[in-house]
Amino acid sequence: MKVLITGASSGIGRDMAEILAQKGYNLVLVSRSEEKLQKVKENILKNNKVDIEIVSIDLSNEQNCKELHNRVKDVDILVNNAGFGDCGEFTKTDLEKELKMINTNIVAYHILTKLYLKDMKEKNSGKILNVASIAGFMPGPLM
């Protein structure tokens, strides 16, 4: 089985990749940093015999989300995990960074879910996990 994990270069995404590799799943690791993805791949392959493909791509760009879907097929499990946050006084935070955050944290999830779900429905098989931050439910001060 093939699992595609976005935000796989660190944190929850990296940890999920390690756990799923231990269970024998083949992985497609996605993140902006090819260098970090390569380190994750090497670390996983030290102890696991699975196939790992890395894809370095910025999911804040809608076209890149579509490109990822066109490039990576036959996904059994999609883990939408890419994301980042920003905090500070609203009038002082950077608008471009906020728009990139919205595109990564919301738009990319929507696009990838829509595209991969269509594939999964066609083969009548598949799972999608959307990872979210508690900040979406209980934002902290100045977020």
Question: Can you describe what each PLM-predicted range is?
Answer:
Residues S133:
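Residue(s) in the substrate-gating loop at a strand-loop-helix junction
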Residues S9-G11:
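Conserved glycine-rich cofactor-binding loop
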Residues N81-D86:
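Conserved NAD(P)H cofactor-binding loop of Rossmann-fold oxidoreductase domains
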Residues E89-T91, K97-I102:
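Substrate-binding pocket helix/loop in short-chain dehydrogenase/reductase
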Residues T113-K114:
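A short, exposed helix-loop element centered on a Lys and neighboring polar residues
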Residues K23-K39:
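Conserved glycine-rich Rossmann-like NAD(P)H-binding loop of the short-chain dehydrogenase/reductase
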Residues E34-E35, V55-E67, L95:
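The beta1-alpha1 cofactor-binding region of Rossmann-like NAD(H)/NADP(H)-dependent oxidoreductases
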